[in-house]
């Protein structure tokens, strides 16, 4: 356990923030793809609502998964940061410096903040895209009703 903590000591921030950065890049890629898709969408080109729904909801699971899990990745970074703070405190030889502890704890919390920073826009876009899915399905159904009446 001690060897693992020493190994993590200088790398926790890079690992956690690297994972969150990767999640952010994937998130932006999926968001941009969805925006471009919804802009060019023509619901009349679909024969069934199931085909439409498949295309409308593509990549939404990824966006939702990132939004739901980014805070946990950040929380993992915070827990590891606090664990390392206590590890250093235990190996300090009884010399407790409150200022140093506070600095380490505040730095540990940045991982949670970063996770939340990734999650909030992800969930906002996910909700907005879900509304677009419903609107486009309703448009398709309205067109089908008009066709049936003719």
Swiss-Prot record:
InterPro entries: ExbB/TolQ_transport, MotA_ExbB_proton_chnl, TonB_ExbB_2. It is found in: Cell inner membrane. It is a multi-pass membrane protein. The gene is exbB. Involved in the TonB-dependent energy-dependent transport of various receptor-bound substrates. Protects ExbD from proteolytic degradation and functionally stabilizes TonB. Keywords: Cell inner membrane, Cell membrane, Membrane, Protein transport, Transmembrane, Transmembrane helix, Transport. GO terms for cellular component: plasma membrane. This is Biopolymer transport protein ExbB. GO terms for biological process: protein import; transmembrane transport. Its main location: membrane. NCBIfam families: exbB2 (TIGR02805). The accessory proteins ExbB and ExbD seem to form a complex with TonB.
């Amino acid at each position: 356990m001690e060897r693992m903590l020493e190994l993590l000591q200088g790398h926790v921030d890079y690992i956690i923030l690297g994972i969150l950065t990767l999640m952010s890049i994937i998130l932006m890629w999926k968001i941009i793809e969805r925006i471009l898709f919804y802009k060019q969408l023509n619901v009349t080109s679909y024969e069934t609502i199931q085909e439409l729904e498949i295309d409308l909801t593509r990549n939404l699971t990824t966006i939702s998964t990132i939004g739901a899990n980014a805070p946990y990745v950040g929380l993992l970074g915070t827990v590891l940061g606090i664990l390392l703070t206590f590890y250093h405190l235990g190996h300090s030889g009884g010399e407790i410096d409150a200022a140093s502890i506070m600095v380490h704890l505040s730095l540990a919390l940045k991982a949670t903040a970063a996770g939340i920073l990734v999650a909030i826009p992800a969930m906002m876009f996910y909700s907005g895209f879900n509304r677009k899915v419903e609107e486009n399905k309703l448009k398709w159904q309205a067109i089908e009703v008009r066709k049936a009446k003719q």
